[in-house]
Amino acid sequence: MELKYKAKNVYKEGTDKEQINGFCEGYKSFLDSCRTERLCAEQAQKKLEAAGFTRYNGEKLKAGGKYYVIYRNKVTMAFIAGRQGIEKGINIIVSHVDSPRLDLKPHPLYEDSNICLLKTHYYGGVKKYQWTAIPLMLTGVIINGTGEKIDVTIGDSDEDPVFYISDLLPHLAADQMDRKLREGIKGEELNAFAGTIPAEGEEKELVKENILMLLNEKYDITEEDLMSAELTLVPALKARDSGFDRSLVAAYGQDDKVCAYTSMKALLDTEAPEKTALCIWADKEEIGSMGVTGMQADFFRNFLARLAEANDVNVYDVIDNSMCLSADVDAAFDPTYKDVYDVNNSAKLGCGIVLTKYTGARGKSGTSDAPAEMVGRIRKIFNDDNVIWQMGELGKVDKGGGGTVAQFIANRGIDTIDCGVAVISMHAPYEMVSKADVYMAYRGYKAFYKAK
């Protein structure tokens, strides 16, 4: 018996590098095509239907049956009915598919000094200075005056134009450089260049007029239609291998799409689980899980209630016997900034999926703090299936903190623990993870779905 604990490195444990690299090719493709929650829901529906899943319409479950629900075009719930009834509990994995970004304001277009720009309002916890001087893609939907939905994506293709937020040249930035880093770029300075060619005529704001003409020509919209739109700017940067050994993935939105992809892929590769296996891709986590598609909303409770009613069981039995992984990322130990990490309690790149007993800040505020019994249960599931895992915390005590959806699920009476992938530069426009950890997340989630 080994008395001392030592974290395992995935590569040193003999895991097949080709298997890891092959798995991550699919992951990178997903990141490039699913930058927002709407795009995630669209692709999920296609993938699920191709895999034999059918839309759930309130019918009684059949063991082995594969079902899905798309809620408000942003939330995906996919599940496989287990051999046991749902009153015995459901094995649930919840991730989120929203990421920090720049949303357009309701009145986004304005002209100043013969330049048309777009006003933005940042979404989630961002370092604002990181969003300047990088290529940006515009994506989302416009609901026009007749209620028709118009999809917009500009900047994804290499043939498309991109958008750009300027920063000051260092030669003129003396005053800016004296600002505190938090205010180095202010929210109202995150204005994207939209165009510089004026329309014909002598009126004012002819560059803005020309942009509106282009939008009308392409999408048949007016400026008023932009008020009923959800348009967002995200990095127009492709997912890439990183490092001489190609052991890392650099990409936008890996918080939390790394857990979303691996949890859904694990479900798709699960056959006839003992208990019903449920994968949820939620929205609005980055702004507190508020709103109709966030995990504080009632859609999850209502879904369980309808599921229980359709199968003639008590919903409270379903809740009491279920368990959940809040599949969200943790901070990977970064040796360049080691002062903010407790090295003995921080997740390390390449050492597997991360269990996080609690998050929160200032004395664990805002966390569910998973009970020891739940930690032990997941630990056994992983060990029995040879999943390489580690424990992690979000930095040193009093250095900061954060939260996940775990607290909202646990508040409903379901044992929940955070379990995800360690990330470098979390919330940056371009984040980084270990390919080995991505693969172990898939392995860990698959083991959880199979648990009895």
Give the role of each language-model region.
Residues 1-452:
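N-terminal hydrophobic/helix-forming segments and targeting peptides
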